[in-house]
């Protein structure tokens, strides 16, 4: 499934560009409800995974992003990963990820795994994601 930037995020992203909105810190999170992202989504459409040493991961270190101009241009973060502990079976199926703004908790983008869901059941099971955005 393609990455979805919801309609609600397009407004504040444009605001960043023209200086009418202030950027916020971002966190990437896993969702475990069987849901396909849409352009009309808000953050409450997603059920964040819980348990087994899981926590959202900050995307706020500028040095972890690489921007490449081109057609399309690319913003790519270093790979983030979650390694689950002995209680991994608490997680179960993970269908994708979503990114939120930290202060307002707005949804920024989401993506359902094309080869998922990933069934987390065993200690040391991992999910790895390389967040990337393109603009053309």
Which residues does each PLM region occupy?
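Small cysteine-rich, disulfide-bonded extracellular modules of the LU/uPAR three-finger superfamily
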Residues: 1-95, 101-136
